[in-house]
């Protein structure tokens, strides 16, 4: 029985117009293919990556509307003696959905949909430091907020901080460049100087770079409705925002004080991300070329069946400390080949000999973990006799004449 369920959705796009399809609809493509119609695939996966439940929705289905149906079906199709934990991402974690999970008898772990402000930190509380598998340094710290009953965990990542800082600097420099252009035009002969026009230009710059503009106070100095100067100063809140770069908040209704346990449970959602990546990339789930909805459903269901086989193999390998992706497994095992040699003997008969090449050490390691033989067969020999050759030639000749 599973104690943790990971729930998420993905979508894949169609090639073609799909005019008569009920499934295909325009929506928010996770692959940025806004020009194509989509179909949505919802999966519930356990921490070992095995699919416990799946459903297919129309392409315009939003993430946060699917949970009620999934939870009801999951309850009827799985047996749970203990209270299970559902891990979801921010797109699904609306207040209504979190309330629904509690009512249905589930605990939840999710990322807060927005950055939590005005929180307090226990001065005597502990800050945990750890290194992730991809060599990212993170800190874990419990925080509290008034009227918030959930356990809140602040997670700060150096990798995420560097990325967000670079993006902030990029947009900020572009915003200031726009403001400087507007100010420079005030001193040009044919530049825009009318105050209302200058305000419009500043408004467009703010609309274009809202994430950077919110940290600046901008004032236009006027004389007789003519702008003479633009004064912009940086707000103090910008420094406070810099301190929060790279941080996100995990919330849960679990009764726990273990920061590492909460983060580990939430981090297991990487497994469902790996599932979607395997389905789309390794098993060619995307794009979909089928014309009718029945063929589309078959395509998606066959992809899920193929994933079951892939994950079973990967699960067995992981138990032996082999953590390769499916792409890497196939690359390694494809180094062993079957070689077919043929020639004619004195009786003019064709002789075929098939042999397997020697597997390298990496292949042997995978075979040993899966309890496979190093060779599917040692040597196979077959002979095509003269009578069979003549018969085949006669049949081929008659087919040619008939055609």
Q: What are the functions of these language-model segments?
A:
Residues 1-403:
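Anion-binding and metal-coordination hotspots
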């Amino acid at each position: 029985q599973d104690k943790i369920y990971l729930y998420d959705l993905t979508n894949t796009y169609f090639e073609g117009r799909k005019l008569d399809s009920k499934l295909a609809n325009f929506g928010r493509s996770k692959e940025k293919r806004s020009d194509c119609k989509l179909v949505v695939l919802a999966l519930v996966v356990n921490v070992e990556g095995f699919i416990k439940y799946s459903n297919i929705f129309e392409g315009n289905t939003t993430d946060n509307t699917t949970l009620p149906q999934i939870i009801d079906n999951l309850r009827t199709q799985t047996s749970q003696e203990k209270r299970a934990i559902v891990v979801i991402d921010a797109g699904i974690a609306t207040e209504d959905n979190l309330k629904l999970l509690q009512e249905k008898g589930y605990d939840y772990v999710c990322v807060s949909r927005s950055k939590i402000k005005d929180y307090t930190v226990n001065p005597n509380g502990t800050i945990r430091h750890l290194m992730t598998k991809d060599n990212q340094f993170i800190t874990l710290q419990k925080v509290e907020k008034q009227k918030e009953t959930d356990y809140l965990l602040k997670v700060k990542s150096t990798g995420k901080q560097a990325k967000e800082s670079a993006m902030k600097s990029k947009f900020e420099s572009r915003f200031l460049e726009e403001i400087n252009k507007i100010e420079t035009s005030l001193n040009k002969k044919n530049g825009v100087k009318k105050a209302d026009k200058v305000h419009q230009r500043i408004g467009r710059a703010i609309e274009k770079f809202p994430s950077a503009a919110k940290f600046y106070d901008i004032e236009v100095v006027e004389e007789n409705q003519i702008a003479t100067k633009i004064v912009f100063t940086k707000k103090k809140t910008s420094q406070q925002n810099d301190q929060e770069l790279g941080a996100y908040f995990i919330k849960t209704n679990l009764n726990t004080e273990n920061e590492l346990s909460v983060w580990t449970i939430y981090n297991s959602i990487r497994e469902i991300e790996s599932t979607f990546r395997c389905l789309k990339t390794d098993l060619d789930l995307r794009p979909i070329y089928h014309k009718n909805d029945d063929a589309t459903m078959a395509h998606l269901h066959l992809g899920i069946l193929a994933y079951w086989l892939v994950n079973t193999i990967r699960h067995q390998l992981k138990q032996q400390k082999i953590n390769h992706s499916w792409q890497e497994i196939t690359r390694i095992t494809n180094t062993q080949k079957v070689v077919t040699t043929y020639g004619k003997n004195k009786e003019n008969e064709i002789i075929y000999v098939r042999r397997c090449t020697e597997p390298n050490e990496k292949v042997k390691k995978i075979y040993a973990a899966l309890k496979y033989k190093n060779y599917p067969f040692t040597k196979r020999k077959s002979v095509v006799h003269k009578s069979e050759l003549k018969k085949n030639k006669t049949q081929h000749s008659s087919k040619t004449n008939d055609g």
